[in-house]
């Protein structure tokens, strides 16, 4: 379907995109393993527990990790409202498994938009905005983004510089939308994709008129 917009409307809430599901494992961790990210650093579960204990009460991970765990449904409101020892006990007992109070494939999705992120088995998602005219170099110029009728778009993955999000980015999310008013050229990108526009295939046939 065609989706074009005026120059100033080239924003996340309007631009056609492709969501790429991939597995990204940071250097130093076992391939396809589960991990956490916090302030640009990556941790296994055991490493996160160790790092957590290094922080003073009321600061750093002692604040951010309980917020994430509560939103993800692993820490109850009562535990979150309790004293520091209660929170510490929940963190110490963290494990991977299928129950609601264990880390699993849904944890990073339910606990989205927190300072702490959880990537289950290294799965993450990347937004790829469709660039129509690759020759337009000026930011937010008319025709830079969009899908135009009678064109085929070929996307070629070129590089990945970091993990995407543990959830599918969605500007229509009623609780925590990916900011729909963000200009396309200002959106974060951790995956490099080359987009080429392929010509349509033309078919010819001879016709005899009688």
For each predicted feature, which ranges?
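Extracytoplasmic cysteine-anchoring/structural motifs
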Residues: 1-210
């Amino acid at each position: 379907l065609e989706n074009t917009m005026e120059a100033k409307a080239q924003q996340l809430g309007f631009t056609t995109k492709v969501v790429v599901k991939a597995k990204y494992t940071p250097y130093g961790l076992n391939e396809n393993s589960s991990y956490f990210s916090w302030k640009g650093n990556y941790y296994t579960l055991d490493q996160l527990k160790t790092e957590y204990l290094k922080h003073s009460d009321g600061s750093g991970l002692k604040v951010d990790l309980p917020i994430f765990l509560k939103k993800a449904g692993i820490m109850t409101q009562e535990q979150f409202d309790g004293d520091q020892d209660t929170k510490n006990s929940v963190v110490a007992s963290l494990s991977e498994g299928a129950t609601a109070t264990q880390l699993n494939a849904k944890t990073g999705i339910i606990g989205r938009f927190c300072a702490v992120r959880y990537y289950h088995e290294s799965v993450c998602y990347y937004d790829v905005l469709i660039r129509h005219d690759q020759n337009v170099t000026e930011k937010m110029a008319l025709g830079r983004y969009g899908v135009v009728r009678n064109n085929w778009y070929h996307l070629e993955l070129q590089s990945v510089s970091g993990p995407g999000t543990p959830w599918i980015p969605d500007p229509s999310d009623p609780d925590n939308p990916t900011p729909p008013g963000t200009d396309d050229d200002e959106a974060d990108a951790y995956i490099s994709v080359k987009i080429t526009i392929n010509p349509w295939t033309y078919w010819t046939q001879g016709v005899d008129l009688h």
